[in-house]
C-alpha cells in the first residue's frame, strides 16, 4: 500500500507544491472526498466545494469526519454528534481535520490537485449515490428539504417491502 501511495503521489509533487498545501493536507482532503462520494465524475466538484469553503474561512461540515470521530457509531448521525468536539469533526473545527479519515484513491488525490472550477459551496445527497450542488445556503436548504423528503419516503417504502435500507442522512438543519 505504501509503495502504491508513492507511485501515485511522486509524479504529483510539483502540483502539490503549486496547490499551496502540504502532501498531508492534500491526502487529508482527498480522504474526505473518498468518503463523500463513490462517483468518479463528482470527485473534482466536491473538491471544489471544500476548497471554496476553505478559501472563504467556512467550516467544511463533512458528515464522514463526524462519523470518523465517533467511537461506536451506530449508523444514525444526530445533531448531538455534529456538535461533539473531536479533532476530526469539521462541523466544530475550522479547516482540515487532524489527519486523513480514510485511504484516498488516486482519483480523490487528483481531484484535490485538479478541482473543478465552480462557485459551489454546498452539496447534499440525492439518495441515489450522487449529489446536488448549490452556490447559496438558500438554494442548499431547498435541496436538503427535497432530497431528505425523498429519502424519508424511500425509508418508509423499504420498511414495507424489505430490509431497512437508509437512503439519506438524518436532517442536519
Model regions and ranges:
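Bacterial extracytoplasmic/cell-wall-associated proteins, especially those involved in peptidoglycan
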Residues: 1-173
Amino acid at each position: 500500500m505504501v509503495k502504491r501511495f508513492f507511485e501515485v503521489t511522486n509524479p504529483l509533487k510539483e502540483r502539490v507544491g503549486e496547490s499551496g498545501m502540504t502532501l498531508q493536507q492534500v491526502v487529508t482532503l482527498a480522504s474526505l472526498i473518498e468518503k463523500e462520494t463513490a462517483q468518479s465524475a463528482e470527485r473534482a466538484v466536491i473538491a471544489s466545494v471544500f476548497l471554496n469553503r476553505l478559501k472563504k474561512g467556512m467550516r467544511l461540515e463533512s458528515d464522514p469526519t463526524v462519523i470518523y470521530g465517533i467511537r461506536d457509531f451506530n449508523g444514525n448521525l444526530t445533531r448531538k454528534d455534529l456538535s461533539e468536539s473531536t479533532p476530526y469533526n469539521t462541523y466544530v473545527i475550522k479547516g482540515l481535520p487532524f489527519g486523513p479519515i480514510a485511504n484516498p484513491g488516486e482519483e480523490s488525490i487528483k481531484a484535490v490537485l485538479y478541482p473543478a472550477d465552480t462557485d459551489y459551496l454546498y452539496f447534499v445527497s440525492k439518495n441515489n449515490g450522487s449529489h446536488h450542488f448549490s452556490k447559496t445556503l438558500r438554494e442548499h436548504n431547498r435541496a436538503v428539504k427535497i432530497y431528505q423528503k425523498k429519502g424519508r419516503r424511500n425509508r418508509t417504502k423499504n420498511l414495507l417491502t424489505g430490509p431497512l435500507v437508509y437512503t439519506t442522512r438524518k436532517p442536519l438543519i
